[in-house]
Amino acid sequence: MSNFSPREIVSELDRFIIGQKDAKRAVAIALRNRWRRQQLEGQMREEVMPKNILMIGPTGVGKTEISRRPAKLAGAPFVKVEATKFTEVGYVGRDVEQIIRDLVEIAITLVREKRREDVKAKAHLNAEERVLDALVGKTASPATRDSFRKKLRNGEMDDKEIEIEVSDSGASPNFEIPGMPGANIGVLNISDMLGKAMGGRTKTRKTTVKDSYPILINDESDKLLDQDQIVQEALRVSEDEGIVFIDEIDKIAAREGGSGAGVSREGVQRDLLPLVEDTTVATKYGPVKTDHILFITSGAFHVSKPSDLLPELQGRLPIRVELSALTREDFRRILTETEASLIKQYIALMETEEVKLEFSDDAIDALADIAVDLNATVENIGARRLQTVMEKVLDEISFTAPDKAGATFIIDAAYVKEKIGGLAKNTDLSRFIL
């Protein structure tokens, strides 16, 4: 687990997300509290629970990204789900325990990648031996192998085609019990049993020497790793460091005077209660306790209110942060200050065609103005509106770029208004096009 301070986490988030200071601080503190808990001993460590977060704000203002980025920074398993995808136990659909099973799968991938890095040097040497076997045969003399090894390391053999044998991981069929989503994971794991019964199956692949290395290094790494250790570590990481982001939680809040579907929505909330507080979920790798998993929930709450959630669920989300709608200045900063801003992306994309793009300050002002106006008059979709506007403005250049190698295009306010101004003013048209 990383030991970044809250200030460092917020500083990292500032590179990618504009504004939303309160939400950034809440997530940064929650992440730091994870590290603090790890420093405690015995009983106190067990007693310290994460303070789950409820983010309230319109779409496109950074809720998901504020949750995802710190998880990536900490190397923690992160899963994003939408509350509306789940149904009450007993109904057709996914049950909420699938969230934890997905989290464990992600944790296993993370741990395996980390362990592969530890054995990469040894795996690389083993992969080199297998490439030599494919090139000169296993019975070749040491002198011949050394001669080819030098050529290999100098890159002289990169384009030569060889045949390699690799593990056939996709050989076993995956069984699922009809009407019981996830049952193949928790109850029966016929796929694993069949895989073991059939032994380590391999398949032959034809590839170039250069392309064979990543495949063989992965194959050799897996041979050097203890899979049981990976699973145990992944279960621990899921329990102690896992982050679950549940979006659209407002859609399962029972609205006053509602009926029918409200029963099922309330059922999903009741199923979430034990998950968010403390339960043990059975996965095919073993049981996972959820009491130290951090849950971050979010919703726009346009129609319903946070108080429409079940009181018990509200109590399990003690930290509330409100995210503000984006202003004109926010849009300007999103276009110019973020690490991989849309403007930087389009400039880089056009450079691949040897076309140069330049944006004037008044063009950025015009783009921000149009995005704000459209969000106000059509539908507020936050920063995502900029993608639609930029795509419309640069449509002609993107289409003709292959024929304009060496050209320079200067995007100014006049160009932006020429391409989009009329559409933005015509509300009926902009509803369909922007």
Swiss-Prot record:
InterPro entries assigned: AAA+_ATPase (IPR003593), ATP-dep_Clp_protease_ClpX (IPR050052), ATPase_AAA_core (IPR003959), Clp_ATPase_C (IPR019489), HslU (IPR004491), P-loop_NTPase (IPR027417)
Keywords for this protein: ATP-binding, Chaperone, Cytoplasm, Nucleotide-binding, Stress response
Pfam families given in the database record: AAA (PF00004), AAA_2 (PF07724)
Annotated SMART domains: AAA, ClpB_D2-small
Places the protein is found: Cytoplasm
GO biological process terms on file: protein unfolding; proteolysis involved in protein catabolic process
Predominant location category: cytoplasm
UniProt entry tagged with the keyword Manganese: no
A single Gene Ontology CC term: HslUV protease complex
MF terms (GO), sorted A to Z: ATP binding; ATP hydrolysis activity; peptidase activity; proteasome-activating activity
Ligand binding (ATP): I18, G60, V61, G62, K63, T64, E65, D247, E312, R384
Signal peptide: none
Summary of the function given for this chain in its UniProt record: ATPase subunit of a proteasome-like degradation complex; this subunit has chaperone activity. The binding of ATP and its subsequent hydrolysis by HslU are essential for unfolding of protein substrates subsequently hydrolyzed by HslV. HslU recognizes the N-terminal part of its protein substrates and unfolds these before they are guided to HslV for hydrolysis.
UniProt xrefs under NCBIfam families: hslU, PRK05201.1
Quaternary structure note: A double ring-shaped homohexamer of HslV is capped on each side by a ring-shaped HslU homohexamer. The assembly of the HslU/HslV complex is dependent on binding of ATP.
Protein family membership: Belongs to the ClpX chaperone family. HslU subfamily.
Name of the protein described by the UniProt record: ATP-dependent protease ATPase subunit HslU
Species name: Brucella ovis (strain ATCC 25840 / 63/290 / NCTC 10512)
Annotated gene: hslU
